[in-house]
Each structure stands twice: as structure tokens, then as C-alpha cells.
């Protein structure tokens, strides 16, 4: 029983404006849709159901029925989902605009209530006020919203969401924004609406209103790699392939600074209809490059590391070792399809082996060493505290020598030409024979930053940018990277 969906279905018959604004895929004929993956609330129709991915942002936030309209909360076109989406910072004036929009689209008055009651009573056995027949009249106006933080912006998608107690497998979390408004004013609005309902329906309306307006907000969730779909990637077998997104736009291109004003468009019905008549779609191909995806990839590598290689005498690089039970790595994982990760893994292991061999550690593949525990963490460059600790453990294991208050280790073992070049790049064109802890960190970070410079990466993929941001980046030709040409960050 999705109250918001039912309200849209019945209220869209009132007038021309409502028929345009309240048209939901969930109320239309079902069309073939992508398979669902997560349980949660569809942002478009607010029902709790199985969700599929959005073609505008790659997040799972739309049901199979609503997916046919390709609406995203980051769109530019002021459809109902976009008008219910607000960005920080929300003012009392912004909330007034939202409440006014609700009053325009979902009015409750004596004439309208009688019209709905008469419509229900036309059918036999419907003289009672059963809740399922009048569900559309039982949607209170609340400041209940689902929230998500993307980069530096926090988005709030207002609506009436049933079944709040159910399991939520999406990164969106419930928040109560009643504190941004006057509690008594909101109560008064709803009591005035409730007065026009029969007594039995008044009781249910009041119960729903207080349950959805007095709840405690939940803590915000952190995004992870699995929150984004791979279905929008051009070539899922290519790690550098672009993500295809579609955004709904309008010809006037409103500024992002006026994001929270979208809900005011419905005040002037004629102007709103003209705006919607100018709508069109824009298609963008964006890079997968971001910290979230990078952290996920390095997390996999840290679990596949074969630290025994740093004591070995294999002539081949770390990933090309065969017929050695201690050093041979499983190269069938999808992560190794990325040539950048291959280079990083080989070069990091080559450099660490050079340090170990240079400082008198005579071991072999099969030896069990305490230093092995820290090697996987050296690939977790996105977790700097953990990474620094791992490098320090490695450095101390090499038994550094104190020279004038600074500890040094040797570097006189042969490294491959690529590592040599990266050492020279980070050490002002020289290959030093001794290294302190800062030099060691600098070289190891340079090897990784050569392809994944996380210092200058976005936290989330560009699919979470607003339409205006995508348009601006596209004009600067900054939506894609040059990894397909095997050009590194440095190059």
C-alpha cells in the first residue's frame, strides 16, 4: 500500500497541471525493465520495493515500473522527483515552497473529499470508509525525507515513505527536517486538511501524520562501490571504459544556486507547462575515476598480495611468477584486467624487494617473516593512516642505521627501469644509495600516484554531479581521462 503512489494516481485526474506533474511509471502500464538488485524506497513513487539502477546517476533508487521514465533526482527538468529534491542549506523559505507545492498538487477540501467519496460509493459494497479505498486522502504533509551525501553536497528527497521499519539496502537514509520549520505551523496545516475528512479517516490521518513527523533521524550511511551499478559502463570488460549517463534537461538551464526553487514552478501552471514542453535529454560519457572505485580496487589487491615475493630471487616481475607455490598469484581475478594496477603491483613489489635485499635480509620464498603482515596495507593508499603505519613497520624491519639523528636504510639492489625512473622522478633526478623514512614513503606513493593520484580525485564518480556540473565539465573536456592511451597521471 504505497500512499504516495495512490495519491498521485487519483490526484492526477484533477486538472491539466496535475496530469503532467503526477504521472508516475508505477501507475502506468508495465514495460520490460532491468532486473532489480536491492530493497529500498523508489524515490520516484516512494513505495518500498525491489530497486534497479538509475540511468542518470548509476545509483539504485528506482523501481522497475518508474525506470521507464529515466528520472533522476539530479536532473535539471523540474519533474516531481526533482521538485521534491533539495540541497543544503535548506531555509524556512525553501520549506514553505515545498509545502505550497504539496497544497497545490494534493489539496484536501470539502468539495474534493465528497467527490472522492461519491466516486467510491458508485461501486457496490463500498459504503464503509475502508482505508484502502481512501488511501489517497490519507497522505499527510510531512518533512520526512531520504538523504544522501555526494561530494560536498547533501541532498534531501522529500516524500511520503511507508514502511520505514523495513530493511534499507541503499545508501539513502531517513531524516526528519521538522526542526528546519515550525512544528506548530506544520501541525496546523495538517489539522486543517484533516477537518474535511470523515471521523474514521481523521483518526488514521492523524496517526500517520504523527508517526511520520515525530520520528528520529537515522545516521547517514557511507557510500561504497556496490551502491553503483556496472550496467551503464560501455564495456564492462575494460577497466577504463566510460560510464554512460542520461539527464533530463530544459532549455532555460536554471542555476544550481537556485536548486531549491524548483518546487515553486507549479505556482504558475501555464509557465510550468511551457517549461516542461522545452524538456529534452542530454547524454554524457564520464570517467570511472574516483576515490570510491580506486579504494575498492586496491582493497581487492591487498587481499591477493603474495608478500613472499620480496624475499625471492625470481627474475620475472611479481605477476609473472609461475610454478612457485609461495609467489605465484592468481591472475584470473577481474581486477588484473586493469593494466594500471598490474604496473603498480609489479613496481611496488620490485621496490620493496630491492629494499629487503639491500639491507642484508637473506631469505627465500618459503621463509615466514613478520614483515609479511604489513605488505598488503602498503596498497591501501586511500587509507593514509593505515598506509603510513605499514610503511613505518617495513622501514623498521629493515633495521635502519642512525646517522646524525636520522635513520637510513640502503638501496643498492637492482630495480627495473620503470621503478628506476619513478625513483628519479621523486628524488630530484637521482637514485640515492640511502633512504630515510620520508624518502621511502615518497617513492612508494609516487609509484601509486603515477596512475592513481588520489590526492586530486573526487570522492564519488562524476555520475553524482548535477547536470550543470556535467555540462560545464564537458565543455572543458574534463569528463574523460587518457588511460585508454596508457598515459599516466604524471604524463
UniProtKB/Swiss-Prot annotation:
Function of the molecule: Plays a role in the inhibition of host innate immunity by inducing the degradation of key host factors required to activate interferon production such as IRF3, IRF5 or IRF7. Associates with components of cullin RING ligases (CRLs) including CUL1 or CUL3, which are essential multisubunit ubiquitination complexes, to modulate their activities.
Family, per entry: Belongs to the rotavirus NSP1 family.
Pfam families the UniProt entry points to: Rota_NS53
Short sequence motif named pLxIS motif, residue ranges: 485-488
Localisation: Host cytoplasm, Host cytoskeleton
GO biological process: symbiont-mediated suppression of host cytoplasmic pattern recognition receptor signaling pathway via inhibition of IRF3 activity; symbiont-mediated suppression of host cytoplasmic pattern recognition receptor signaling pathway via inhibition of IRF7 activity
Region ranges (Interaction with host IRF3): 320-491
Protein name in the entry: Non-structural protein 1
InterPro entries named among the record's database cross-references: Rotavirus_NSP1
Alphabetically ordered keywords of this record: Host cytoplasm, Host cytoskeleton, Host-virus interaction, Inhibition of host innate immune response by virus, Inhibition of host IRF3 by virus, Inhibition of host IRF7 by virus, Inhibition of host RLR pathway by virus, Interferon antiviral system evasion, Metal-binding, RNA-binding, Viral immunoevasion
Region feature Zinc-binding domain, mapped onto this chain: 42-79
Amino acid at each position: 500500500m504505497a500512499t504516495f503512489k495512490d495519491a498521485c494516481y487519483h490526484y492526477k485526474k484533477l486538472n491539466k497541471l496535475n496530469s503532467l506533474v503526477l504521472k508516475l511509471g508505477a501507475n502506468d502500464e508495465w514495460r520490460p525493465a532491468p532486473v532489480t538488485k536491492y530493497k529500498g524506497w523508489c524515490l520516484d513513487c516512494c513505495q518500498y520495493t525491489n530497486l534497479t539502477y538509475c540511468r542518470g546517476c548509476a545509483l539504485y533508487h528506482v523501481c522497475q515500473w518508474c525506470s521507464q521514465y529515466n528520472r533522476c533526482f539530479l536532473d535539471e527538468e523540474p519533474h516531481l522527483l526533482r521538485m521534491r529534491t533539495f540541497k543544503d542549506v535548506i531555509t524556512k523559505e525553501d520549506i514553505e515552497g515545498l509545502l505550497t507545492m504539496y497544497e497545490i498538487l494534493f489539496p484536501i477540501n470539502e468539495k474534493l473529499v465528497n467527490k472522492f467519496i461519491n466516486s467510491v460509493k458508485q461501486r457496490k459494497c463500498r459504503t464503509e470508509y475502508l482505508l484502502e479505498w481512501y488511501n489517497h486522502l490519507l497522505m499527510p504533509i510531512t518533512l520526512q525525507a531520504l538523504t544522501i551525501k555526494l561530494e560536498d553536497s547533501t541532498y534531501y528527497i522529500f516524500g511520503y515513505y511507508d514502511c520505514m521499519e523495513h530493511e534499507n539496502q541503499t545508501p539513502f537514509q531517513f531524516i526528519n527536517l521538522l526542526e528546519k520549520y515550525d512544528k506548530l505551523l506544520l501541525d496546523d496545516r495538517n489539522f486543517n486538511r484533516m477537518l474535511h475528512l470523515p471521523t474514521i479517516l481523521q483518526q488514521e490521518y492523524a496517526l500517520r501524520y504523527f508517526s511520520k513527523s515525530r520520528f528520529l533521524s537515522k545516521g547517514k550511511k557511507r557510500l561504497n562501490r556496490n551502491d553503483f551499478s556496472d550496467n551503464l559502463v560501455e564495456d564492462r570488460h575494460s577497466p577504463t571504459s566510460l560510464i554512460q549517463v542520461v539527464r533530463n534537461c530544459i532549455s532555460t538551464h536554471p542555476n544550481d544556486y537556485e536548486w531549491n526553487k524548483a518546487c515553486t514552478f507549479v505556482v504558475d501552471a501555464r509557465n510550468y507547462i511551457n517549461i516542461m514542453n522545452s524538456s529534452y535529454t542530454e547524454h554524457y560519457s564520464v570517467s570511472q575515476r574516483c576515490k570510491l572505485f580506486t579504494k575498492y580496487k586496491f582493497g581487492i589487491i591487498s587481499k591477493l598480495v603474495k608478500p613472499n615475493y620480496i624475499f625471492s630471487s625470481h627474475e620475472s616481475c611479481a605477476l609473472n611468477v609461475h610454478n612457485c607455490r609461495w609467489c605465484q598469484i592468481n591472475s584470473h581475478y577481474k581486477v588484473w584486467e586493469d593494466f594500471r594496477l598490474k604496473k603498480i603491483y609489479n613496481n611496488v613489489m620490485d621496490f620493496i624487494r630491492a629494499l629487503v635485499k639491500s639491507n642484508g635480509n637473506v631469505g627465500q620464498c618459503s621463509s615466514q617473516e613478520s614483515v609479511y603482515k604489513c605488505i598488503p596495507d602498503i596498497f591501501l593508499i586511500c587509507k593514509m593512516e593505515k598506509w603510513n603505519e605499514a610503511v613505518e613497520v617495513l622501514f623498521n624491519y629493515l633495521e635502519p642505521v642512525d646517522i646524525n639523528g636520522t635513520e637510513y636504510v640502503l638501496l643498492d639492489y637492482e630495480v627495473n627501469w620503470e621503478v628506476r625512473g619513478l625513483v628519479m622522478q621523486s628524488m630530484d633526478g637521482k637514485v640515492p644509495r640511502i633512504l630515510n623514512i620520508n624518502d621511502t614513503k615518497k617513492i612508494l606513493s609516487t609509484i601509486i600516484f603515477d596512475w592513481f593520484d588520489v590526492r586530486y580525485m573526487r570522492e564519488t564518480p562524476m555520475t553524482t554531479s548535477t547536470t550543470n556540473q556535467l555540462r560545464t565539465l564537458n565543455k572543458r573536456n574534463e569528463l574523460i581521462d587518457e588511460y585508454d592511451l596508457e598515459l599516466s597521471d604524471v604524463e
